[in-house]
């Protein structure tokens, strides 16, 4: 028996799925168009994000078509639409699995890129097509496996695996395993970034202290004898901007003449350097916190996205399909459809896509955005370089956000 089988419930769930699919379509197109129209969004990592965006778009369209049919009065689970429902369920399983593979692939390749040059990384960079092919192969295997053993049916707004038990063990639990794996990977990514920053800061601090310890070089000048008339400052020199230097020079002289030795202001230089370092350390701590938030946002977004649907599914499995209201079921369906919309935020607004669109629409804001790029670029600023590596801290120091 299909869940919420009455006509009103089916149309209500279809409307929820339709609204969510439209938002996901917009989010997916936002990422795809950003890749083709924004030069800063064409790095190697953005090529991987493009693959994820394409899968998000196809999944959103696969939600959009059946939900629109149901809203307009067509019954996708009727006997004459059995083929349509089976195709819709097969594609649903295909793209859900494909997005899972894309998520963990992007996380693993990001970690690999931050770990330094390697033959594997070199091969991946030269064979992006293989990275694109891998999620399709894995998801096709999963979809055909499900198609061979289980039936697809209307689950409320779209077709998917008909059995809740199968959906729970074949889709929900593996997705949570992937979320946990991604969490561990991005924690490792954050530790690599933090370690590289510390190494760069240590080298910079060492160079700064070495320059502070260097003995000041005296500058010896001989001031000629002067008379009181020479201490008068010419007004023309003041108006031309040379008055202050003339004033200092004339006052430094003496009526008897002497050898003047001027040392570098070591104490003032050290105070200035300490203030600059304190400000720089505070800014770096702020940037590190932003990177930490960004690292946790990747897996956390999907954990939030799948938390309620998983809880609802567990309750329904435990109670034989009952136990939640139509509104809770609608919320769970909405979150399932939100993949493209969430990815647009996590991989778009969270990185440099939003700033790129702003620069394209408002070129006058480009200078301000370039100043803010150090805190808004996120991990993209690191992995978009040709060969970021821990073995060259200077590169990290220049390129880290």
Curated annotation (Swiss-Prot):
- This protein is called Ascaroside receptor GPR3
Extracellular compartment residues: 1-16, 69-93, 150-175, 316-321
List the GO biological process terms.
adenylate cyclase-activating G protein-coupled receptor signaling pathway; cell surface receptor signaling pathway
Stated family: Belongs to the G-protein coupled receptor 1 family.
Instruction: Spell out the Polar residues composition-biased ranges.
Output: 391-401
- Give the residue ranges for region: Disordered: 206-259, 362-401
Q: Per UniProt, what is one GO molecular function of this protein?
A: G protein-coupled receptor activity
- The residue stretches assigned to a coiled coil in this entry are none
Species source reads Arthrobotrys oligospora (strain ATCC 24927 / CBS 115.81 / DSM 1491)
Gene3D superfamilies the UniProt entry points to: Rhodopsin 7-helix transmembrane proteins
Q: What induces it?
A: Induced following nematode exposure; induction is dependent on transciption factor STE12.
* GO cellular component term of the entry, any: plasma membrane
Q: Which residues lie on this side of the membrane: Cytoplasmic?
A: 38-47, 115-128, 197-294, 343-401
The organism's place on the tree of life at top rank: Eukaryota
Q: Does the keyword Transport apply?
A: no
What role does this protein play?
G protein-coupled receptor that senses nematode ascaroside pheromones and signals via adenylate cyclase to positively regulate trap formation for nematode capture.
Q: Where is the composition biased (Low complexity)?
A: 239-257
The main place the protein resides is membrane
Localization (cell): Cell membrane
* TM segment ranges: 17-37, 48-68, 94-114, 129-149, 176-196, 295-315, 322-342
Q: How the protein assembles, per its UniProt entry?
A: Interacts with ascaroside receptor GPR2; may form a functional heterodimer. Interacts with guanine nucleotide-binding protein alpha GPA2; to activate adenylate cyclase and positively regulate nematode trap formation.
Q: Does the keyword Transmembrane apply?
A: yes
This protein's membrane topology, according to the annotation, is: Multi-pass membrane protein
């Amino acid at each position: 028996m299909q869940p919420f089988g009455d006509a009103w419930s089916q149309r209500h769930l279809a409307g929820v799925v339709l609204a969510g699919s439209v938002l996901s379509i917009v989010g997916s197109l936002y990422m795809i168009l950003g890749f083709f129209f924004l030069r800063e969004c064409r790095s190697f990592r953005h090529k991987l994000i493009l693959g994820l965006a394409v899968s998000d778009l196809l999944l959103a369209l696969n939600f959009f078509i059946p939900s629109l049919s149901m809203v307009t009065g067509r019954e996708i689970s009727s006997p004459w639409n059995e083929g349509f429902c089976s195709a819709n369920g097969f594609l649903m399983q295909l793209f859900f699995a494909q997005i899972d593979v894309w998520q963990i692939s992007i996380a693993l390749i990001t970690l690999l890129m931050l770990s330094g040059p390697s033959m594997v990384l070199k091969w991946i960079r030269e064979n992006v097509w293989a990275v694109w092919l891998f999620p399709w192969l894995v998801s096709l295997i999963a979809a055909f496996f499900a198609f061979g053993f289980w039936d697809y049916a209307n689950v409320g707004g779209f077709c998917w695996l008909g059995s809740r038990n199968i959906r729970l063990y074949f889709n929900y639990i593996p997705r949570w395993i992937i979320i946990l794996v991604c969490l561990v990977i991005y924690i490792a990514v954050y530790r690599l970034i933090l370690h590289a920053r510390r190494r760069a800061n240590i080298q910079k601090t060492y160079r700064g202290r070495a320059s502070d310890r260097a003995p000041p070089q005296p500058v010896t000048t001989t001031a000629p004898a002067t008379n009181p008339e020479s201490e008068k400052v010419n007004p023309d020199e003041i108006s031309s901007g040379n008055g202050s230097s003339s004033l200092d020079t004339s006052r430094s002289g003496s009526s008897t003449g002497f050898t003047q030795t001027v040392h570098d202001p070591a104490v003032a230089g050290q105070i200035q350097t300490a203030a600059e370092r304190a400000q720089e350390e505070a800014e770096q701590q702020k940037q590190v916190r932003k990177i930490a938030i960004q690292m946790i946002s990747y897996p956390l977004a999907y954990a939030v996205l799948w938390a309620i649907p998983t809880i609802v599914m567990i309750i329904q499995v435990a109670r034989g399909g009952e136990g939640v209201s139509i509104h809770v079921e609608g919320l769970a369906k909405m979150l399932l459809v939100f993949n493209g919309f969430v990815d647009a935020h996590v991989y778009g607004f969270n990185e440099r896509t939003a700033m790129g669109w702003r620069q394209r629409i408002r070129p006058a804001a480009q200078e301000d955005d370039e100043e803010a790029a150090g805190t808004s670029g996120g991990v993209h600023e690191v992995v978009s370089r040709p060969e970021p590596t821990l073995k060259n801290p200077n590169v990290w120091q220049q390129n880290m956000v």
